[in-house]
């Protein structure tokens, strides 16, 4: 199961990313763009052969969500609470091969609720139990890529300011059939503070060689490193080049849509 980086930032009791090293206090912002040469179209998720055993398991899981307002395989998570006048039927699910392993997965997203209840879960089929197992458990701000997830933080209350919204990267591990934490990305604007009292670290002027007034923080395996803008843009291009977001076929969690999975 995906250990959701510290990205969980209290959301959905996740553990999808390494824990941020700075307390977060400021509002959202735009991300520094990387130059692109074309406006590519979004790839579709793959269409594997239909597995009715898997679909039946997904159908049962969705009925647990719809009828019991509970997350399958998360017995201690409590009830799903949806803010009125909305209902669970306003929330979303999809059945598609999102991880590229040739088998369908079940994605369930609940967002019309309190912050810590907002989450997206990717379930895979477990033929040993004829049930479902969790491949990824994260906050709702997920962009799906082939073999990769980009998960936005639930809050931007650190020192990133208007440089970027913090996010985590997780990669699909075929051997484990689940997503694994890789990176947590944040930023530090010198105008907000030139000293991080939490880590007792002064602003790294030696890293900010372009005198941009901000640096990026990449956390990997619990270790944090600083990057200036030029180095970050190269690093970011290495992560996202030739990867386009997948189009996920979301639909509402209605009785009719659940029943239509297997007839």
What are these regions (language model features)?
Residues 1-4:
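Sec-dependent signal peptide recognition
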Residues 8-11:
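C-terminal motif of bacterial Sec signal peptides marking the signal peptidase cleavage site
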Residues 14-35, 39-64, 154-263:
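Acidic, small-residue rich beta-repeat scaffolds with periodic aromatic anchors
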Residues 47-87, 129-141:
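Blade-edge motifs of beta-propeller repeat domains
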Residues 89-98, 140-150:
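Beta-propeller blade termini
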Residues 100-110, 147-155:
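Acidic/hydrophobic-patterned starts of short beta strands in beta-sheet-rich repeat architectures
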Residues 112-115, 158-160:
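Short glycine/acidic-enriched loop and turn motifs that connect beta-strands
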Residues 117-135, 170-173:
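Beta-propeller blade repeat segments, especially FG-GAP/WD-type strand-to-loop junctions
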């Amino acid at each position: 199961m995906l250990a959701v980086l510290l990205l969980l930032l209290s959301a959905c009791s996740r553990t999808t990313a390494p824990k941020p090293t700075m307390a977060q206090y400021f509002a959202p912002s735009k991300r520094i763009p990387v130059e692109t040469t074309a406006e590519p179209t979004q790839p579709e998720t793959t269409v594997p052969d239909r597995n009715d055993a898997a679909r039946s398991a997904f159908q049962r899981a969705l009925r647990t969500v719809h009828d019991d307002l509970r997350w399958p395989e998360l017995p201690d998570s409590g009830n799903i609470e949806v803010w009125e006048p909305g209902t669970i039927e306003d929330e979303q699910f999809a059945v598609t091969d999102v991880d590229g392993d040739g088998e369908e997965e079940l994605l369930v997203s609940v967002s019309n609720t309190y912050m810590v209840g907002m989450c997206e879960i990717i379930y895979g089929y477990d033929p040993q139990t004829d049930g479902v197992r969790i491949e990824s458990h994260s906050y709702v701000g997920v962009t799906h890529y082939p073999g990769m997830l980009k998960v936005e933080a639930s809050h931007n209350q650190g020192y990133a300011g208007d440089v970027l919204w913090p996010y985590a990267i997780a990669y699909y591990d075929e051997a484990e059939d689940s997503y694994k934490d890789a990176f947590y990305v944040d930023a530090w604007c010198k105008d907000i503070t030139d000293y991080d009292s939490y880590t007792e670290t002064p602003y790294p002027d030696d890293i900010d060689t372009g005198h941009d007034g901000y640096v990026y923080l990449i956390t990997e395996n619990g270790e944090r490193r600083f990057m200036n803008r030029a180095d970050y843009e190269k690093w970011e291009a290495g992560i996202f080049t030739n990867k386009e977001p997948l189009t996920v076929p979301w639909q509402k969690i209605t009785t009719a849509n659940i029943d239509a999975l297997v007839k």
